[in-house]
Regions:
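Alpha-helix N-cap/helix-start capping residues at coil-to-helix junctions, especially the first residue
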Residues: 1-86, 202, 326
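Noncatalytic, beta-rich nucleic-acid-contacting surfaces in large DNA/RNA-processing enzymes
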Residues: 16, 22, 32-36, 40-46, ...
Length: 874
């Protein structure tokens, strides 16, 4: 609706006339409107009567509906005439609680917090805390800290799980002393000035993660405590890659093309100018035309996920207020009709309490551990340096571990071999887009001893030794500016913001001169300039260390629970996961860990998952066609003593269940009785269809996943490994087309006519240019001697940089009757390469090559880029 209004405001026409449809401006508007409201919404411009109605037209339309009265018109005019300009005031003092002496109260609580942590006698901590308190007092931020401390203290007393920290507030010792965060900033080398810059007047931003299943209780507390509370509106825009995706969807451009081009760019500017996108822009020029018109416009509105504002007086006195449906409920909640920055400018106090599912998982796991083992687990008291936990992460067993389970992160942890929290925090910074391809390569090489650790000056060693001399964090940029460049910490924070956000170049040059001048006292001017250039090049990828340490702490907590209490942890994951694909991954992981996953049964299952003995039992609601409501009806009516009894209940009128539900129960073995015996073949064939669960009979080593490509990223060119269930096989003369399915999608791959692959089975498949070279059933991987499995199992590769390993050599006959082959090679970086062996090289390759061995090759390329075998050296 807002975008629609914007369009009307751009080119509004008072009346229709004969030039209406011919107007170029209106034609432009029509096209944009067709994009926004056409095709996917079945609405086109022609269905709208877009012009400003005259009084006569409005009157006529209302009279036809029998609702027109003269006072409607006159009252509307009267109200309109009463509307006056209203200047939004800024910088108001709207803190909801007026403490008599907030600074003293804050200091008393903080010092008691230090004492409780056994740090009150440590002069380093006391001095740092006093320094922070002075800044807070000077900025008059004390009441804000007391409000946040009160909220978090209440939540913890109520047994609501609160995160260890989030964002730059984890760098504050005051927040640690107040128990707002659980991260010791001195121990981890975190900076208060990254959180609050004394030269900035903006309010501090303390972000807090709250157990998502109980976040509403925290909001209710704020309403009870401070009365005037509202959520914050968000305004979503058409921008960057989203514009390309939205326009492409409406223009029915193939999703495969869209996904391919969006992997090549990050911004709209890159899309419009990069040579790598030329092919897409030439093929679909209208995407850029419409995208330019839409970029920056409002796409929709929402409610801020974490932020609420509070005030000492009714909020509507200072800002527009509306009510909206609360996400996930039928209740309507008050929302300020401005965004977060505008709310802060007015003086409304923003409190960030973000619901985080991981905290609900941890809370549920701890509760089940206490119930099953009579042990009270406090995450703040567990051993944070347990080598077994870090070894599990380094082996790639990351499924369910907070932030670490995505494939790129898992791959990074395997490459790194993390051994402590510092390295886990570094991984949190390195996994960010761009970081791994820049500073990350040096970090890994230095960590593994392949590159010498060096420092521009010894002063840098103090704060970069943990990262092997690499500048990964924004805090390290700030420390270099202070300790090497002689700048103030306030100026250093400005440098961080300027470099990271590419702000005003003139201001940037001023600080560059300051840094080079100061650093030249320690190093040569050209070295100082080079170091600044490195900051400039890498700062866009550098990360907030405070946030990295806080979230890595949360990652470690989940990893620790997974290692020591796998049953309770996996149950908690499943209980809190609503996404079926993710839940499927967790079920597969549970089976890999040796946790029996019991199929549902009408007499034994609850609505959702439950722990049963040493295993996890499926809930009835996980079955296709069975909702929570239907599951409850069955549970209320059980036990059923026979299939006939179950059938009679299902078909009894008024019970609210149907034959589809009964059939699904039967197919998955959930309706097994003496008069309806279990059919294992039916169950195997229907696991995916009915439970969304592929059949994985054996554990798959976690490091395999580093080499497995998801089907949504499938490319018909190249050599790679996929894993999926065979959904169907279409046989034809000379070939078979095998449709393979994983959690991201499906793809058709070609195999020989007499393929040995079976439907319903899950395979590890080596693909070369859209052909299957080898397919190993997952339940046969453990005993397989194939070259592919050997390669995947190597921890140390048994060949040199000059050699390449033969993963697969598959001969075939050309149409002319000549012999050629598809060859898949692996290098020491573990990358796979697709190589074509033409008839001229076939005899030599056939005689010399053996799968599972390494050789020195001479490779070439054809004009179309196909890699070909030219010679085998030795």
């Amino acid at each position: 609706v807002q975008e629609f209004k914007l369009l009307l405001n751009t080119h509004a026409k008072v009346e229709k006339d004969h030039t209406y449809d011919k107007s170029k401006k209106h034609k432009d508007m029509m096209e944009r409107l067709d994009y926004l409201y056409g095709k996917d919404r079945q609405i086109t411009f022609n269905k709208f009567d877009i012009h400003l109605l005259s009084y006569e037209e409005i009157k006529s339309a209302m009279e036809k509906q029998g609702i027109f009265r003269e006072d409607i018109y006159s009252n509307t005019i009267e109200i309109a005439n009463k509307v006056e300009d209203y200047d939004l005031q800024e910088g108001l003092d709207l803190l909801p609680v007026q403490y008599r002496n907030p600074d003293k109260e804050l200091k008393d609580i903080a010092m008691q917090g230090l004492k409780d942590k056994g740090l009150l006698e440590d002069p380093v901590y006391v001095e740092r805390l006093n320094d922070e308190l002075k800044v807070i007092k000077d900025k008059k931020f004390g009441p804000y800290f007391l409000v946040v401390q009160s909220m978090i203290n209440w939540a913890k007393k109520e047994g609501i799980m609160v995160g260890p920290g989030r964002g730059s507030s984890a760098g504050s010792l005051l927040c640690y002393a107040l128990n707002i965060t659980d991260i010791d900033p001195i121990k981890h080398g975190l900076l208060f000035f990254r959180f609050i810059n004394p030269e900035r007047n903006d309010f501090p931003d303390i972000d807090t993660d709250i157990q998502d299943s109980r976040r509403d209780e925290v909001k209710d507390y704020l309403v009870r405590q401070y009365r005037h509370v509202a959520s914050i509106a968000t305004f979503l825009q058409f921008k960057d890659k989203g514009v390309v995706r939205d326009v492409s969807r409406v223009l029915n451009i193939p999703l495969s093309d869209v996904n391919k081009v969006l992997k090549l760019v990050d911004t709209w500017e890159e899309y419009c100018s990069s040579r790598s996108t030329d092919w897409f822009r030439e093929k679909y020029p209208e995407v850029q035309v419409y995208g330019e018109q839409l970029r920056g416009r409002i796409r929709g509105t929402g409610i801020h996920a974490a932020g609420v504002v509070t005030s000492k007086n009714p909020i509507f006195r200072y800002a527009p207020l509306e009510t909206r449906s609360s996400p996930g409920s039928d209740e309507r909640i008050p929302v300020v009709g401005i965004d977060m920055e505008e709310a802060e400018r007015i003086g409304l106090i923003k409190i960030d309490a973000l619901g985080l599912k991981t905290l609900s998982v941890i809370k549920d796991a701890i509760s089940m551990i206490k119930e099953n083992h009579y042990v009270d687990i406090d995450p703040l008291k567990i051993n944070m340096e347990d080598p077994k936990v870090y070894e599990m992460l380094s082996d790639g067993y990351t499924k369910g571990v907070f932030q670490c389970e995505a494939t790129p992160y898992t791959n990074l942890l395997v490459k790194m071999g993390v051994k402590n929290l510092n390295e886990l925090a570094a991984s949190n910074a390195l996994v960010r887009p761009g970081a791994m391809n820049t500073i990350g390569k040096d970090y890994l090489a230095r960590k593994h001893g392949k590159q010498n650790v060096s420092y521009v000056h010894q002063v840098m060693k103090e704060f970069t030794s943990d990262t092997y001399g690499c500048v990964l964090y924004q805090e390290q940029v700030m420390q270099a500016c202070v300790h090497l460049g002689g700048m103030t910490m306030a100026d250093a924070d400005k440098v961080r913001k300027i470099i990271g956000k590419k702000k005003d170049a003139r201001e940037f040059d001023v600080f560059k001169e300051k840094f080079v001048e100061g650093a030249s006292k320690y190093v040569a001017p050209n070295v100082a300039r080079d170091l600044w250039h490195d900051f400039e090049a890498h700062a866009g990828y550098s990360f907030n260390k405070s946030h990295a340490v806080a979230y890595s702490t949360l990652s470690y907590w989940t990893a620790w629970l997974k290692y020591y209490y796998p049953l309770e942890f996996m149950f908690a994951l499943l209980k809190n996961e609503s996404n079926k694909d993710t839940r499927t991954e967790y079920l597969i992981e549970a089976k890999r860990m040796g946790i029996p996953v019991k199929l549902p049964h009408i007499n034994d299952s609850d609505i959702d998952f439950k722990i049963e003995g040493k295993g996890i039992r499926f809930g009835l609601s996980a079955i296709k066609y069975i909702s929570d409501n239907i599951a409850k009806k069955y549970i209320d009516a059980r036990p059923f003593n026979s299939y006939k009894e179950l059938e009679e209940f299902t078909f009894t009128k008024g019970n609210g269940v149907n034959s589809r539900a009964l059939n699904a129960l039967k197919l998955i073995g959930a309706a097994t009785f003496s008069d309806n015996p279990r059919n294992d073949e039916d169950i195997r064939q229907n696991l995916y269809e009915v439970l969304n669960l592929p059949e994985f009979n054996v554990s798959l080593p976690a490091h395999y996943h580093a080499f497995i490509k998801e089907i949504e990223d499938y490319d018909e060119k190249g050599s790679f490994v996929i894993m999926g269930m065979v959904k169907s096989i279409k046989r034809s003369k000379g070939w078979s087309r095998v449709e393979v399915l994983d959690k991201t999608g499906s793809v058709g791959i070609f195999d020989e006519e007499q393929t040995t692959i079976e439907t319903g089975q899950t395979y590890l498949i080596l693909v070369n240019d859209n052909r299957i070279l080898s397919a190993i059933p997952v339940d046969q991987i453990k005993g397989s001697s194939s070259a592919l499995v050997k390669f995947l199992n190597y921890k140390q590769l048994p060949f040199t940089n000059e050699e390449m390993y033969v993963v697969s050599f598959k001969p075939r006959i050309t149409k002319a009757g000549k012999k050629m082959a598809s060859l898949t090679l692996a290098d020491t970086s573990r990358d796979l390469h697709s190589v074509m062996v033409f008839p001229t090289s076939f005899a030599q390759a056939y005689m010399k090559l053996e799968e599972g061995h390494a050789y020195k090759f001479t490779l070439g390329k054809t004009k179309d880029g196909t890699v070909i075998l030219e010679d085998i050296n030795g």
